């Protein structure tokens, strides 16, 4: 069903002004990685990760990734890691302000990962702009200074000791007053029954 959802999402997004888009998903373990949607059937207790990267009418890209738990109480370890990923993102967002460096953002994310003894992938996110990915990553080697109106998508790939993780992403713009989220929809709950109510 992943491919079915992809087609429905693409139709909706294009009807609402998306010029270009990339839709990726994941319906099986490990949930910290995404790929092209497949024809794998989604089961009632599944955890389904859905990523949408959209270019609007002016050509600028944004990205949102949301995990969807098909039943409440399933995938408890994954849910726990999801909460930790959100905490790590928030720590990074607090450092995403003009005058700091990209590596400061990465270190804030790393502190949360260490607190929960999570392993971290190569990066914690990337820039967004006129080109998808726009050329630089959130990583410890990136000494680039953060400037006003810089845009980053945060999606640290954090894994617990069993290799479980959940990809989640929001896109932010840096401002003098702090980072502002550009993808603040569907953050209240990761559960399908709650999300259905939000989109009615």
Language-model segments: what does each one mean?
Residues 2-200:
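Active-site neighborhoods and metal-handling regions in enzymes and metal-associated proteins
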């Amino acid at each position: 069903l992943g491919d079915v959802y992809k087609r429905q999402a693409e139709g909706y997004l294009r009807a609402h002004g998306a010029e270009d888009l990339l839709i990726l998903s994941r319906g099986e373990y490990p949930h910290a990685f995404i790929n092209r949607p497949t024809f794998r059937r989604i089961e009632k207790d599944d955890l389904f990760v859905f990523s949408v990267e959209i270019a609007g009418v002016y050509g600028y890209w944004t990205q949102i990734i949301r995990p969807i738990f098909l039943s409440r109480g399933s995938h408890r370890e994954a849910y726990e890691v999801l909460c930790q990923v959100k905490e790590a993102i928030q720590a990074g967002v607090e450092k995403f302000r003009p005058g700091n460096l990209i590596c400061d953002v990465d270190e804030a994310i790393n502190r949360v990962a260490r607190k929960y003894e999570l392993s971290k992938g190569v990066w914690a996110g990337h820039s967004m702009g006129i080109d998808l990915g726009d050329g630089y990553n959130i990583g410890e080697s990136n000494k680039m200074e953060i400037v006003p109106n810089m845009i980053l998508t945060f999606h640290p790939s954090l894994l617990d000791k069993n290799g479980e993780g959940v990809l989640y992403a929001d896109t932010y713009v840096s401002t003098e007053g702090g980072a502002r989220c550009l993808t603040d929809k569907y953050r209240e709950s990761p559960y399908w029954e709650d999300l259905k109510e939000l989109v009615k």
